Design a protein with these regions (language model features):
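Short substrate-entry loop that stabilizes the transition state in hydrolases
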Residues: 67-70, 74-82, 87-127, 265-268
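Domain-level recognition of soluble alpha/beta enzyme cores
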Residues: 24-87, 109, 304
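Conserved alpha/beta-hydrolase "acid-adjacent" motif
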Residues: 244, 265-272
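Alpha/beta-hydrolase active-site loop
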Residues: 131-157, 161, 190-206, 210, ...
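Short beta-strand immediately N-terminal to the catalytic nucleophile in serine-hydrolase-like folds
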Residues: 166-168
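Short glycine-enriched nucleophile-adjacent loop
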Residues: 147-150, 173-185
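Catalytic active-site module of serine/aspartate enzymes centered on a nucleophile-bearing elbow/loop
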Residues: 302-349
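Short beta-strand/loop motif that positions the catalytic acidic residue
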Residues: 252, 258-260
C-alpha cells in the first residue's frame, strides 16, 4: 500500500463556497496565525468551535475528488468554556487542515474547540519533500498553535484551563505520539527511504525531489518534543511508526489511544502501531478492520473514481476495506474520537 499520494497537481485547490448561514448551523470556523520560532514563519491555523448562528456557511475540503464539510465562517462562539483539541493533518492529499474537516466539524459539534495548523511543505504550491520529512518540527507546530489559541482574544475566555488534547491522522498520528513524548531515532529516519518497502509513494517523491535523508541535518530529530500542557493524545493510523526510538515510549506519561485502520496482520509495518502501544504504560489500542489507510480521507465524489482511472493514479484513494461505506467508517471514527476526548478532557480526574 502506498501511503501519501502526491497528486496535488490534478486536484483542484480547496474551495470555500459561500452561502448565507442558517439557524441550523452549529459549528464555526475561523483562521488565525501562530508565530513559529522553530520555522521562522507564521503558521496558518484553522479553528473549529461550537457556534451561535451567524457568519457565512463555507464548505471546507471540497475538491474535484472529495466532498467538503460545512461550517460557519467567523460565527459568534457559543458562550461557554470548552476543551481544546490540537489536530495534526497528514501529507499529500490529506496535507492540510481542511482535509480533516470531516472529523473536526463533528468534534466541535460535540463541544470541543479544534485547532489545526498547516504543517509547511506537506501539500500545495509550496510542497517540499525536505520540509515534510522534518518530522520533529511538526510537534512544535502544535505547541505554537496552542500558545496562539490561548492568547487569541476570540477564544481565550472560552477555553477550559488544563483541558488540552492532541489528535493526529497518518503523519499527523506520528506528530500526536511525538508531542506526547515519543522521540524519533535519527538513524532510522535517515534510512527510511533506502528501500520502497516501507512507503513507496512517499519515498518516490523524496527521491524525485533530490532529497537525501542521509545528507540532511538530523541531529535535532531525536529531541524530546513533548508539551506538558497536553493531557491526552490520540493517533489514527499513525505513520511512520517505525522511525521512533522504542525506549522513548516508556517515558510517555499521559494516556494515549491508538487506532489502526485494517485487519491485524494486514496493516503495513510502517503504520502498524500494535507493538508500540504495548510499550506505553497508559495506551489503548484498537483496529477498524474493514477500513484502509485511505479511509481517513474525506468521502469521494461520484466522479472521483473516473478521475483516478483517467489520470492513472496508482493509489486507490477512494477504496476502503470490505463491507462498509466511508461515511459509515467515518461515523465510527468520529464516535471513537468523541468518546476518547470526552473521557480524557471532560471528566474530572
Amino acid at each position: 500500500m502506498k501511503f501519501w499520494t502526491m497528486l496535488c497537481a490534478i486536484i483542484v485547490s480547496t474551495m470555500l463556497m459561500q452561502h448565507p448561514a442558517n439557524a441550523g448551523d452549529t459549528v464555526g470556523v475561523r483562521q488565525l496565525s501562530a508565530a513559529s520560532t522553530e520555522r521562522g514563519i507564521d503558521l496558518d491555523v484553522t479553528v473549529w468551535y461550537p457556534a451561535q448562528p451567524g457568519g457565512e456557511t463555507v464548505s471546507l475540503g471540497d475538491s474535484n475528488l472529495f466532498v467538503g464539510t460545512s461550517a460557519m465562517r467567523d460565527a459568534p462562539i457559543t458562550d461557554a468554556k470548552f476543551p481544546l483539541i490540537l489536530l495534526s493533518h497528514g501529507a499529500g492529499l490529506a496535507g492540510n487542515p481542511q482535509a480533516m474537516s470531516w472529523i473536526a466539524t463533528p468534534l466541535a459539534r460535540q463541544g470541543f474547540v479544534v485547532a489545526a495548523p498547516t504543517h509547511p511543505g506537506n501539500t500545495g504550491k509550496n510542497r517540499s519533500a525536505a520540509e515534510t520529512m522534518k518530522l520533529w518540527l511538526r510537534p512544535a507546530d502544535l505547541t505554537a498553535t496552542l500558545t496562539a489559541v490561548e492568547k487569541e482574544a476570540f477564544f481565550r475566555d472560552h477555553l477550559e484551563q488544563g483541558k488540552v488534547g492532541a489528535l493526529g491522522l497518518s503523519m499527523g498520528g506520528n506528530t500526536a505520539l511525538a508531542i506526547a513524548g515519543a522521540r524519533v531515532d535519527p538513524k532510522l529516519l535517515a534510512a527510511y527511504c533506502d528501500t520502497d518497502l516501507l512507503n513507496a509513494s512517499l519515498c518516490e517523491w523524496v527521491r524525485q525531489s533530490g532529497v537525501d535523508l542521509h545528507a540532511m541535518d538530523l541531529q535535532p530529530a531525536g529531541r524530546d518534543n513533548r508539551d506538558g500542557r497536553i493531557r491526552f493524545a490520540m493517533a489514527i493510523d499513525p505513520a511512520p511508526t517505525d522511525i521512533f526510538d522504542v525506549k522513548s515510549f516508556a517515558g510517555i506519561s499521559i494516556p494515549v489511544d491508538i487506532v489502526n485502520l485494517g485487519r491485524p496482520g494486514k496493516i503495513p509495518a510502517t503504520a502498524d502501531a500494535s507493538g508500540i502501544a504495548k510499550a506505553m504504560s497508559k495506551a489503548s489500542y484498537a483496529t477498524v478492520e474493514d477500513a484502509s489507510h485511505y479511509s481517513m480521507f474525506a468521502e469521494c465524489k461520484p466522479g472521483a473514481p473516473g478521475i483516478i482511472a483517467s489520470e492513472q493514479i496508482g493509489d486507490p484513494v477512494c477504496d476502503d476495506g470490505e463491507g462498509r461505506s466511508r461515511s459509515e467508517i467515518h461515523a465510527q471514527l468520529i464516535d471513537m474520537a468523541a468518546a476518547a476526548f470526552t473521557r480524557a478532557l471532560k471528566t474530572d480526574p
